[in-house]
């Protein structure tokens, strides 16, 4: 895990989708998708449920994102 991955994660939560997060961060969508996949595999949790309307955080994902926000605030 690194700070960039945490920023991507928080942006997905904030903007509701990987593509919207990529646009807001001026980042490549595949990079954000890969970062999300890496975090989910590293921590063995599903952070978001994927749907046709966007990304919805799971309960575990919501807690993980709250921790990520705290790290980014410091």
Stretches found by the model and what they are:
Residues 2-5, 29, 61, 68:
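The N-cap/first-turn positions of alpha helices
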Residues 6-13, 58, 65:
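Hydrophobic residues on short alpha-helical segments
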Residues 10-28:
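Short helix-boundary/capping micro-motifs
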Residues 22-23, 58, 62, 69:
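Residues within alpha-helical segments
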Residues 42-43, 64-74:
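Alpha-helical linker/hinge and terminal dimerization helices associated
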């Amino acid at each position: 895990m690194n700070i960039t991955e945490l920023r991507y994660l928080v942006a997905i939560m904030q903007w509701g989708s990987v593509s919207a997060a990529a646009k807001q961060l001026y980042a490549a969508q595949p990079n954000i998708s890969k970062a999300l996949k890496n975090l989910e595999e590293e921590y063995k949790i599903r952070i978001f449920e994927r749907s046709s309307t966007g990304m919805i955080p799971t309960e575990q994902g919501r807690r993980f994102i709250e921790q990520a926000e705290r790290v980014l605030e410091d």
